[in-house]
């Protein structure tokens, strides 16, 4: 099920040569999308034909002002098919829901119809915060809730009783909320998905089948998931 995989190379120390090599590998594997930082996107887009280019925005902190976030997303939308943007985490944790709503409406709107996955950073959230944020993501017109950047701080997550990695339980909870609310959102799980067994358990837990418009898995090690088919 490599057609559900977003192959991500997002470490800040990667060289252009390494990222270009990743693009060629993405094409060989036939993943859904190849996800990179904005700096590298113009260099690798010509290397992709059957694989979509995904670019992250305000990654990994979600701490830029709304105007800057929207401007960046609009620029990325000129050359990328998909955009993974981090939610304004500080505003979420401050429970400034009106500001969160204004931000995401502006940022998602700036994408001009490109596929947008909003990274909610599950490890940092309480259940109340999750649900309020999911509601706003749905209202914003985004296409996916994405679970995590994969860069979450373990010490803070532990204080909230949350893992920093993807689990079938968390995937099921997100999907269940989407179904109960009748949202037209997909689920992308990211963080610590390194085996085919993990991936299958998460896909099964989501319960949306194997449609890449509804289910994605983010990983930096797609080769490990090849046995999924």
Curated annotation (Swiss-Prot):
Keywords from the UniProt entry: Cytoplasm, Lyase, Schiff base
Main localisation: cytoplasm
Reaction catalyzed: 2-deoxy-D-ribose 5-phosphate = D-glyceraldehyde 3-phosphate + acetaldehyde
Any one of the GO BP annotations: deoxyribonucleotide catabolic process
Keyword Cytoplasm on entry: yes
Protein localization: Cytoplasm
GO-annotated cellular components: cytoplasm
This enzyme's EC code(s): 4.1.2.4
Active site: 84 (proton donor/acceptor), 146 (schiff-base intermediate with acetaldehyde), 188 (proton donor/acceptor)
Pathway membership, UniProt: Carbohydrate degradation; 2-deoxy-D-ribose 1-phosphate degradation; D-glyceraldehyde 3-phosphate and acetaldehyde from 2-deoxy-alpha-D-ribose 1-phosphate: step 2/2
Keyword Hydrolase: no
Highest rank taxon of the organism: Archaea
GO MF annotations, alphabetized: deoxyribose-phosphate aldolase activity
Function statement: Catalyzes a reversible aldol reaction between acetaldehyde and D-glyceraldehyde 3-phosphate to generate 2-deoxy-D-ribose 5-phosphate.
Annotated family: Belongs to the DeoC/FbaB aldolase family. DeoC type 1 subfamily.
The protein's name in its UniProt record: Deoxyribose-phosphate aldolase
Gene: deoC
């Amino acid at each position: 099920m490599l057609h559900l995989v977003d192959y991500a190379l997002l470490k800040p120390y990667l060289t252009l040569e390494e990222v270009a090599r990743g693009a060629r590998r993405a094409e060989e594997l036939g993943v859904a999308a190849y996800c990179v930082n904005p700096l590298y996107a113009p260099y690798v887009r010509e290397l992709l034909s059957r694989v979509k280019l995904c670019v992250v925005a305000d990654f990994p902190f979600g701490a830029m002002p709304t105007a800057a976030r929207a401007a960046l997303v609009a620029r990325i939308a000129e050359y990328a098919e998909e955009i993974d943007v981090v939610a304004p985490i500080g505003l979420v944790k401050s429970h400034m829901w009106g500001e969160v709503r204004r931000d995401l409406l502006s940022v998602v709107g700036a994408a001009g119809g490109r596929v947008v996955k909003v990274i909610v950073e599950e490890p940092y959230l309480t259940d109340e915060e999750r649900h309020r944020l999911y509601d706003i993501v749905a209202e914003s017109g985004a296409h996916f809730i994405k679970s995590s950047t994969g860069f979450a701080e373990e010490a803070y997550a532990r204080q909230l009783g949350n893992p920093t990695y993807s689990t079938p339980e968390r995937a099921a909870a997100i999907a269940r909320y989407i179904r109960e609310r009748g949202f037209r959102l997909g689920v992308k799980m990211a963080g610590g998905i390194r085996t085919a067994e993990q991936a299958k358990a998460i896909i099964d837990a989501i319960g949306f089948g194997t449609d890449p418009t509804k289910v994605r898995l983010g990983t930096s090690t797609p080769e490990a998931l090849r046995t999924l088919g």
